[in-house]
Amino acid sequence: MKSIIFIIVFTIHLGLLAQNEYSCAEMHLKGKVKSIAETTQYAYPPQKLATMKMQSPIPTLYSFNQRGDLTEKIIGADIKYVYQYDRYQHYLSGGKKYVYSEKIKADIMFIRVKDGAFWEELTFYKKMTEKLRIDYLSPVHCKISHTIGGKVIDEKEIYYQKPYSYSKIDYILRDGKKEVYTYNDQGEVTTIIFYDENGEVTNSYGYEYVYDAQGNWVEKKQTFQTPIPDKYPEIVRREITYYD
């Protein structure tokens, strides 16, 4: 009997979404993708399962226009992001609305220079403002800052193998610690190795993928070299539809 049993659960992330969200190309999708239904399950040990209530999977649905832009992201029955875009010169700008139970909870504006300078996203809530800013210091180096209500939540530096590309991260520095990424031929991360301030390995994550005929992954399995308290490996599955 397997020592680990899988149960499907869903985690909602309401914070700012990463800069690789706005198009098929930035999400490494191949072909003319129309929509993605994505669910996540976790590998819980039996002792954890014994104290948990079973939950049904809640998919995250992504919709794209024929140009490849993300137009909607729907999480379960209550959460929806609606995207609008403007393109001019070397910029991509626009906005999206965070809708919860059919009520607009936040307006979000973003602007990005395609090949340099900065990328920024501002989320306006009723009581606070959330800001994510990326400053490109060179074609292979940038700094990222994340603030909520003027308070710094996270700061890190990223070094790339390719100029201005989020598909080939070399390593991330945060608070003196280092994360090193390696990739497969499809551009998906296969390992993340974590180092402490002294350069010693503290843990590593591994990822395995199953691909469809178009070359897009439809299953991603995560493993941990060392177990992490209250954190469990993920299995993410996708159902992808394409434009004719």
Predicted region positions:
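Buried hydrophobic residues that stabilize the cores of well-folded domains
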Residues: 19-244
